[in-house]
């Protein structure tokens, strides 16, 4: 019986001398609801916890209370400079972590979805700021193309060319532009407008259009229908 008690006592002493396991940080679940994701502070708390966790002091094993005085004094002398260095690192880390937090408070917090959508070309570009342009009265006048004021001589020559042929070729257009001092686009537009005026005033339709109209396949004419009201 005495031997068993001694064996149990030795086992208890051995178990008491073992160092306690380090305390692990509690796992925190993030709520991935839409309302939480759209908040500007989504993910900020997790980053702060990581910074403090990285800069924190790891738990060291406690020295055995039953050890002699020499070992305890030696461990205290060794742990004191280490703890002082670690405390300095913690202070430096806290000062560094506090400085970006102040800068982030000055800046506007944008939600995370702004950096992951089609509104930004690059994930780090952030939301775009569009500058409003000042409206000038001169812009409206510049957009409109000024009408060409033809002289009497230019009009006579253009009408003569139009009587010979309603469709002008490129060579004739270049020759008229050099002779009359006009651009080729001005001459081309004048011929197009002249043909449109004649077609609109005469109302002439070609044989193919008349045939299609007879079959009910082509009819661009508009007619007004008046409904008779019953008295």
Curated annotation (Swiss-Prot):
Known SMART domains for this protein? HOX
Q: Which residues form the signal peptide?
A: none
Q: Which Pfam families match?
A: Engrail_1_C_sig, Homeodomain
Biased amino acid composition, Low complexity: 68-102
Q: Which CDD domains match?
A: homeodomain
Q: Where is the composition biased (Basic and acidic residues)?
A: 43-56
* Superkingdom of origin organism: Eukaryota
Give the GO terms filed under biological process for this record. axonogenesis involved in innervation; regulation of transcription by RNA polymerase II
Q: Where is this region: Disordered?
A: 1-29, 43-105, 121-148
Tell me which InterPro entries the record gives.
Answer: Engrailed_Homeobox_TFs, HD, HD_engrailed, HD_metazoa, Homeobox-engrailed_C-terminal, Homeobox-engrailed_CS, Homeobox_CS, Homeodomain-like_sf
Query: Where is this chain's protein located in or outside the cell?
Result: Nucleus
User: Keywords assigned by UniProt?
Assistant: Developmental protein, DNA-binding, Homeobox, Nucleus
The molecule here is called: Homeobox protein engrailed-1a
Which species is this UniProt entry from? Danio rerio
């Amino acid at each position: 019986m005495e031997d068993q008690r001694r064996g149990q006592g030795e086992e208890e002493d051995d178990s008491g001398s073992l160092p306690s396991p380090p305390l692990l940080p509690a796992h925190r679940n993030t709520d991935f609801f839409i309302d939480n994701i759209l908040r500007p502070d989504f993910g900020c708390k997790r980053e702060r916890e990581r910074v403090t966790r990285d800069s924190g002091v790891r738990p060291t094993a406690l020295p055995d209370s039953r050890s002699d005085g020499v070992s305890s004094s030696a461990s205290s002398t060794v742990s004191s400079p280490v703890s002082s260095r670690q405390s300095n690192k913690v202070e430096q880390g806290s000062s560094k972590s506090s400085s970006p937090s102040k800068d982030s408070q000055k800046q506007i917090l944008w939600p995370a979805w702004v950096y992951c959508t089609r509104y930004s070309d690059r994930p780090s570009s952030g939301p775009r700021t569009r500058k409003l342009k000042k409206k000038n009265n001169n812009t409206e006048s510049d957009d409109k193309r000024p009408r060409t004021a033809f002289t009497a001589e230019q009009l006579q020559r253009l009408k003569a060319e139009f009587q010979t042929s309603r469709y002008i070729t490129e060579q004739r257009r270049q020759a008229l532009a050099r002779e009359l001092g006009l651009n080729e686009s001005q001459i081309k537009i004048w011929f197009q407008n002249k043909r449109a005026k004649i077609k609109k005033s005469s109302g002439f339709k070609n044989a193919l259009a008349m045939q299609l109209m007879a079959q009910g396949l082509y009819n661009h004419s508009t007619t007004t229908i008046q409904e008779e009201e019953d008295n």
